[in-house]
Swiss-Prot record:
Pathway: Protein biosynthesis; polypeptide chain elongation. It comes from the Bacteria. This is Elongation factor P. Pfam families: EFP (PF01132), EFP_N (PF08207), Elong-fact-P_C (PF09285). Keywords: Cytoplasm, Elongation factor, Protein biosynthesis. GO terms for cellular component: cytoplasm. The gene is efp.
Length: 185
């Protein structure tokens, strides 16, 4: 159990059989009446965001989320299959669960998968990945590091904006949170 006074961003609670993550919280102490906590909660399973108010000191069941490191082994149809390298258990994620993160996922990559009651909730990719450029416009003599950017397609099919001097076959570091170019590898 967790008190509403102990809410922090990232705290996970269980409400009506669903797992919710606290996105924002604000402790309010009005001049008249009792204190309360105004929160913005995100459903970890569906991604829905709701605003909810709790009385100060109200206790709620905390959701125990287990984080396991798993390796992306292969893609079966549109499903992504991951394997725990210690127990050899497999977990499957749908394209909806993967979202935009699928475009940075390579076979053999290790990721963290979040479980609740043996159900797959979410996936956490590393903050950056090394990807190879498969298609981009050729660099022209005179292109500099301080110049503009151009679109490039990486081995996973994602489009990344890269500096003009980057060419096909080079390996670059990409931020998985926003898809930005971080540098050469």
């Amino acid at each position: 159990m967790i008190s509403s006074n102990d809410f922090r961003s990232g705290t996970t609670i269980e409400i009506d059989g669903s797992v919710w993550r606290v996105v924002e919280f604000l402790h309010v102490k009005p001049g008249k009446g009792s204190a309360f906590v105004r929160t913005k909660l995100k459903n970890v399973q569906t991604g829905n965001v709701v605003e909810r108010t709790f009385r100060a000191g109200e206790t709620l069941p905390s959701a125990t989320i287990e984080k396991r490191t798993m390796q992306h082994t292969y893609k079966e149809g549109d499903q992504f299959v991951f394997m725990d390298m210690e127990t050899f258990e497999e977990a499957t994620l749908t394209p909806v669960q993967m979202g935009d993160r699928a475009k940075y996922l390579k076979e053999g990559m290790e990721v963290n998968i979040l479980f609740w009651n043996d159900q797959v909730l979410d996936i956490e990719l590393p903050t950056s990945v090394i990807l190879e450029i498969t298609d981009t416009d050729p660099g022209v003599k005179g292109d500099t590091a301080t110049g503009g950017t151009k679109p490039a397609i990486v081995e996973t099919g994602a489009q990344v904006m890269v500096p003009l001097f980057i060419s096909i076959g080079e390996r670059i570091k990409v931020d998985t949170r926003d898809g930005s170019y971080l540098g050469r590898e």
